[in-house]
């Protein structure tokens, strides 16, 4: 399997970018055929005032951008540092006193939304020396295919970030924050545990994990996301969360995401609508805050 991955990565990085764009379009269409029913349902429930044409357009763009993100994971190990720097911009917000990372020695919890090109966020330590002065621990879900998992994990850890599977992620994230480092955790994935909260007008299961860590160590919390600007190009941004308890942070981060998805079609299409965040919304979990 690995030789096939290497060959495909070589083609993606050596041929004109039109080849990668075409592959993203084709794979996005396949994803739409597989997950289109879920995507249409999610978008229709979240935006009941939008017509079927809008749902179809946003859903298909979201699929293409999801495929684009996956292809970057495959291709990036063969990209030079110069090319990575050319494609990714660090926004001033990441280095600002108000919204950026706190000074070295102070831990931080980063709430990460599942936007297109979030894979490019792993290059942050390469792009600015200030961001490489501390350890980054990122909680993730390993891929099922061993060869693909090794390739993608190596790509994600290439510039210094350390990945921790969900099984060990809580302990390693706690340790990182306690020692003054950074823990990055997806807060908007489907979860089979957690609490129930309204998101885009419907109940869904939300994780309190990042909020629990931030509350435990009384550390700053930030939204950290990749703002897509073009194919395989983005601007990394950060925004401060102001709540200090786990419930407040969970509510605030989800409210931030809801506002972002409602802010325009481009931002809406950047989210991973193919995952069914509302799948467990009717399960007998406790309501957030109870």
Regions found by a protein language model. Give the residues of each.
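Catalytic core of membrane glycerolipid acyltransferases/transacylases, capturing the structured
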Residues: 106-166, 192-195, 228
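A conditional alpha-helix N-cap/helix-loop micro-motif detector
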Residues: 87-91, 145, 163-167, 203-204
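Active-site metal-coordination segments of metallo-dependent hydrolases
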Residues: 37, 142-146, 204-207
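Flexible, glycine- and charge-enriched loops at secondary-structure boundaries
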Residues: 52, 163, 246-247
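Non-catalytic C-terminal accessory region of glycerolipid acyltransferases
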Residues: 31, 60, 100-103, 127, ...
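Membrane-anchoring hydrophobic helices of lipid-metabolizing enzymes
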Residues: 1-112, 117, 149-154, 160
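Short glycine-/small-residue-rich flexible loop motifs, especially phosphate/cofactor-binding loops
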Residues: 40-41, 122, 153, 211, ...
């Amino acid at each position: 399997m690995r030789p096939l991955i290497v060959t495909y990565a070589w083609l993606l990085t050596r041929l004109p970018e039109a080849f990668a764009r075409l592959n993203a379009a084709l794979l996005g269409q396949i994803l739409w055929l597989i997950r289109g029913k879920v995507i249409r349902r999610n978008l229709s429930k979240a935006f009941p005032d939008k017509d079927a044409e809008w749902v179809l357009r946003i859903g298909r763009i979201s699929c293409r951008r999801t495929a684009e993100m996956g292809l970057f994971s495959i291709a990036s190990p063969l990209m030079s540092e110069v090319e990575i720097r050319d494609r990714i911009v660090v926004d001033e917000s990441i280095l600002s006193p108000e919204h950026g990372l706190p000074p070295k020695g102070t831990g931080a919890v980063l709430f990460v939304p599942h936007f297109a090109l979030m894979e490019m966020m792993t290059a942050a330590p390469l792009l600015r020396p200030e961001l490489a002065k501390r350890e980054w621990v990122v909680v993730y879900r390993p891929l099922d295919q061993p060869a693909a998992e090794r390739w993608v994990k190596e790509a994600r850890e290439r510039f210094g970030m350390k990945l921790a599977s969900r099984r060990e992620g809580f302990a390693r994230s706690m340790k990182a924050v306690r020692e003054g480092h950074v823990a990055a955790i997806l807060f908007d994935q489907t979860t089979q545990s957690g609490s129930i909260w309204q998101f885009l007008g419907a109940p869904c299961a939300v994780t309190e994990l990042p909020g629990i860590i931030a509350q435990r160590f009384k550390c700053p919390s930030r939204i950290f996301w990749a703002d897509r600007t073009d194919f395989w190009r983005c601007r990394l941004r950060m925004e401060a969360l102001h709540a200090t308890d786990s419930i407040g942070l969970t509510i605030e981060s989800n409210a931030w995401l809801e506002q972002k998805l409602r802010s325009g079609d481009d931002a809406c299409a950047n989210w991973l609508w193919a995952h069914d965040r509302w799948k467990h919304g009717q399960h007998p979990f406790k309501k957030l805050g109870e």
